[in-house]
Each structure stands twice: as structure tokens, then as C-alpha cells.
Amino acid sequence: MAVQQNKKSPSKRGMHRSHNALTVPGIAVEPTTGETHMRHHISPNGFYRGRQVLKNKSEA
């Protein structure tokens, strides 16, 4: 079983935890439809950066 050799000070403990913060996901708004989607992903109806890259199943 691992046992620490020296106690970690509150400062070092805080430095160790500094990378554990949660980040807000990058949400983008599609300019043509106004829908929200994750950045660098297509919107649910097939648009990416203002142009349609996938056709809808009803159109195909």
C-alpha cells in the first residue's frame, strides 16, 4: 500500500487541483437555422457554417 513520505502543503495541494476545473462546452449557433450545436459539429438538420453538408432523409 502506498504511503506518503511528506505531507503536501495546502499550496501544493491547490496547485495539484488547479487542472480539475470543469469547462463550459463550446456551443455555437447556426446562422441559417438558429439552432445550437457543439462547435466543429454539424447541426441536427445537416448544416455546418451556414451551408448544408448533409441532405435530410426526407429529401433523399
Curated annotation (Swiss-Prot):
Basic residues composition bias: residue spans: 9-19
Name of the protein described by the UniProt record: Large ribosomal subunit protein bL32
Taxonomic superkingdom: Bacteria
Source taxonomy: Bacteria, Pseudomonadati, Pseudomonadota, Betaproteobacteria, Burkholderiales
Location of the region described as Disordered in the Swiss-Prot/TrEMBL record: 1-60
InterPro entries in the record: Ribosomal_bL32, Ribosomal_bL32_bact, Ribosomal_zn-bd
Similarity comment text for this entry: Belongs to the bacterial ribosomal protein bL32 family.
Residue spans crossing the bilayer: none
